[in-house]
Amino acid sequence: TYVTRCLQKTDDIRRLTDRMFEYALVYDVSEPEQIRMIPFSLSRLLGLFREQMDFLELAGFHTDISFPDADISDITTPDALTIQADPELCKRILNNLFSNILKYGSKQETVTLSMQLPPEINKDAALCLALKNTVKPEHSAVESNRIGLKSSTRNMERMGGKLVVFQTNTFFEVTLSFPVTAP
């Protein structure tokens, strides 16, 4: 239908502009844009992940969110963990990661998000979120320029965090580590 085609074109344009920005961010050595670091609650960060996971489900993926180290009340209380982050950079990072899952991920296996809380809050404490999925067989040997991952890695570093990728021909895992601040 006409509306479906319009939505597809809108998505195509968004992806193209995202790619242009990513190329500029990764390869431009001039001064990067200013970031706006603000206190970001754990529940707010998880809300961004949940939105993306919900979108995957609408696209036909199976998802699972697992927090083995945390009681749900630990996550939703107002004084739960806080990170310092730029909300827009967080959204960009998640858009990159989840668009890769949409493009390369297999709908036959579950996409999982797991979280590891730091045992104690100190200067080295980090909140780790791991996103795992199986790669579609037809994409297992596809070469990519990894611009989105490079951009996401750089954005995590700009916020004082870290992004680590582990990948095989059939499996993809990315771990985001955010420095934690005391409530």
Where are these regions (language model features)?
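Short alpha-helical segment of the dimerization/phosphotransfer core of two-component systems
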Residues: Q8-L16
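A residue-level detector for a conserved hydrophobic packing site
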Residues: C90-K91
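Detector for a conserved hydrophobic position within an alpha-helical segment of the HATPase_c
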Residues: M156-E157
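Glycine-rich/acidic phosphate-handling loop/turn and adjacent ATP-lid/helix
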Residues: A125-I147
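Short helix-loop "hinge" at the ATP-lid/N-box region of the Bergerat-fold HATPase_c
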Residues: I101-L102
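Conserved micro-motifs of the catalytic ATP-binding
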Residues: D28-I35, T76-A85
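Short conserved segments within the C-terminal catalytic ATPase subdomain
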Residues: L56-T77
